[in-house]
Design a protein with these regions (language model features):
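Short helix-onset patch at the extreme N-terminus, typifying the N->h transition
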Residues: 7-8, 27
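Sequence/structural signature of beta-propeller domains
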Residues: 57-393
Length: 393
């Protein structure tokens, strides 16, 4: 079982010969050790156009659960993320943003655990790392968010044992203040996180109505800006492939392309590779991007093709060939998914309902029969996706 969002394996305080990923974990650990004690102390039109012209038939799966509608009317629900409870996977947490008000926490059945009013939190992403020395090993989870109210990148750091205790005591919630905050020089939009061999814990922060992307990392001094690059146009959805050091990012509006940046220690973003475009398999805006990892460094890149309400699968590895597409259709009790912004997928056995992982998708048009409700998130067993598409596991 694989999970893009956490890295396992004990990390020792003394430096030693390591593989690249272990070096990245060591870099994060070095920062954490110095910070640990302080913790303890304290495009609707485009969518309509492309939906009307696209009549192609695609395989369909059904959501098995959905979350309650978010508190805000209109275009509000946006981006999901997940924390895997490795001690009790069925008691994991789904995070979801209401980009006009804050962050929700849900269980795997879509039931609300908590809601924190934080302002305009647009996108979120997580990484969990097993850190410690010979005497003390703990998992820490890092929750990144793009805060449009304050124009910042926000970062919460949770010790997983404490999170588990709060879940058991029904007292879990995202704190109202982050552990770290970095003031951005752009109008913030989307965000995705990663673990990099050179820079450790990183976050890619995109610009609203602009082409810039900021790259941040966690240091002993807090969140530092590493560099800023030009992605060519407004971008939101992104995902970082830690093992392959590849940033996938969707450019919206005029061009409508999905790009891949294959990186090295120089973090040179000058030569993106075009994975797909509107001339290919993308309808309208490319939006949320996620990874579904399979053994031997294989797996799938998944993109929300928003304009025709489908999800595209590509090979995770270069040259990222398009494989197929699917939709999330309606069941007797849950409506279909359309006009999706953010998505999240992982390959991890969470429960008997999710034997091969999970997919969470924002639903841009949430309905109850003929009645339109506020937006929400739909939850899919990824086994159903693999079965209906008949692709390699």
């Amino acid at each position: 079982m694989m999970n893009q969002n956490f890295i396992t394996g004990e990390i020792h305080l003394g430096y030693r010969n390591m593989m690249n990923m272990e070096q990245a974990q060591q870099l994060v650990l070095h920062t954490l050790i110095n910070l640990f004690h302080s913790f303890k102390k304290s495009s609707i039109v485009l969518a309509f156009f492309f939906t009307t012209y696209s009549l192609a038939d695609y395989a369909e799966v059904e959501a098995i659960y959905e979350t309650p509608p978010v508190v805000t009317k209109g275009d509000a629900a946006d981006d999901p993320a997940i924390w895997v409870n490795k001690s009790n996977p069925s008691n994991s947490i789904i995070f979801g943003t209401d980009k006009k008000s804050g962050i929700y926490s849900y269980n795997l059945q879509g039931q609300e655990l908590s809601y924190t009013n934080l302002g305009n939190i647009n996108n979120i992403d997580t990484r969990t790392i097993n850190v410690g020395d010979d005497e003390n090993v703990s998992d820490f989870t890092f929750l990144f968010a793009s805060n449009r109210t304050l124009g910042s990148v926000d970062l919460w750091v949770f010790e997983d044992n404490e999170t588990r205790e709060k879940l058991e005591n029904n007292s879990w919630e995202v704190p109202s203040k982050p552990s770290f905050r970095g003031k951005s020089d752009i109008i913030v939009y989307g965000i995705c996180a990663g673990i990099d061999p050179k820079y450790g814990l990183v976050a890619f922060l995109t610009e609203d109505t602009g082409p810039r992307v900021e790259v941040w990392n966690l240091t002993e001094n807090g969140l530092d800006l590493i560099t800023t690059f030009n992605n060519g146009g407004e971008s939101e959805g992104c995902v970082y492939d830690d093992l392959n050091r590849t940033l996938f990012i969707s450019e919206e509006e005029v061009r409508g392309v999905l790009k891949a940046y294959r990186l090295d220690d120089s973090f040179d973003f000058s030569e993106p590779y075009i994975v797909d475009s509107r001339e290919g398999q993308i309808g309208g805006d490319p939006e949320g991007v996620s990874l579904y990892k399979t053994p031997n460094n294989s797996g799938y890149l998944i993109l929300s093709s928003q304009g025709d309400s489908k999800f595209n699968l590509y090979d995770r590895n270069y040259p990222y060939d398009y494989i197929t597409s699917f939709r999330i259709g309606s069941s007797k009790s849950i409506d279909n998914v359309t006009d999706t912004d953010g998505i999240e997928t992982i390959n991890y056995k969470l429960s008997e309902e999710y034997p091969e992982g999970i997919m969470i998708a924002q639903d841009g048009l949430n309905k109850d029969g003929y009645r339109t409700k506020r937006q929400n998130f739909k939850i899919v067993s990824f086994k159903d996706v693999l079965d209906v598409l008949d692709v390699t596991r």
